[in-house]
UniProtKB/Swiss-Prot annotation:
UniProt-annotated location(s): Nucleus; Cytoplasm; Golgi apparatus membrane; Cell membrane
Source organism of the structure: Rhinolophus ferrumequinum
Record-given protein name: Caveolin-2
Coiled-coil region(s): none
GO CC terms, sorted: caveola; cytoplasmic vesicle; focal adhesion; Golgi membrane; nucleus; perinuclear region of cytoplasm; plasma membrane raft; sarcolemma
Post-translational modification: Phosphorylated on serine and tyrosine residues. CAV1 promotes phosphorylation on Ser-23 which then targets the complex to the plasma membrane, lipid rafts and caveolae. Phosphorylation on both Tyr-19 and Tyr-27 is required for insulin-induced 'Ser-727' phosphorylation of STAT3 and its activation. Phosphorylation on Tyr-19 is required for insulin-induced phosphorylation of MAPK1 and DNA binding of STAT3. Tyrosine phosphorylation is induced by both EGF and insulin.
InterPro entries for this protein: Caveolin, Caveolin_CS
């Protein structure tokens, strides 16, 4: 009682006269990408988004709707999912890809030029800081703690019940 879904393939054809190759960017051969429409998620990053009608709507054995209602709702689910996704990607994909590119470029730049030099500087300076800190501890803090300990060691307390 399922519907067969069709896969829509979209191809764009342009004349060489209307396509300018003088922009300075070396574009790849368009015929190479026309056949490469297979797997757009080779690393399975979004495998959890493969949601079908049966994953969302399920009727147990005891409660079944009419067959026509089930078929129409399944068809409407698939069509609306397809159309809404295409509509949203039409308007949001390019701006969001641009924003993600800016974000990742900024984070990469900050990591390469600020974070890693700071970490390397800290790691380079740490042995000197460790030596200085050990000297300060031995000269100031250890005698102070020893004298406070001696002072409190002479204190005695007696409890009496009166």
């Amino acid at each position: 009682m399922g519907l067969e879904t069709e896969k829509a393939d979209v191809q764009l054809f342009m004349d060489d006269d209307s396509y300018s190759r003088h922009s300075g960017v070396d574009y790849a051969d368009p015929e190479k990408f026309a056949d490469a429409g297979g797997d757009r998620d080779p690393n399975q990053l979004n495998s959890h988004l493969k949601v079908g009608f049966e994953d969302v709507i399920a009727e147990p054995e005891s409660t079944h709707s009419l067959d026509k209602v089930w078929i129409c709702s399944h068809a409407l689910f698939e069509v609306s999912k397809y159309v809404i996704y295409k509509f949203l990607t039409l308007f949001l994909a390019i701006p969001l890809a641009f924003a993600a590119g800016i974000l990742f470029a900024t984070l990469s730049c900050l990591h390469i030029w600020i974070v890693m030099p700071f970490v390397k500087t800290c790691l380079m300076v740490l042995p000197s800081v460790q030596t200085i800190w050990k000297s300060v501890t031995d000269v100031v803090i250890a005698p102070l703690c020893a004298s406070v300990g001696r002072s409190f060691s002479s204190v005695s307390m007696q409890l009496s019940r009166d």
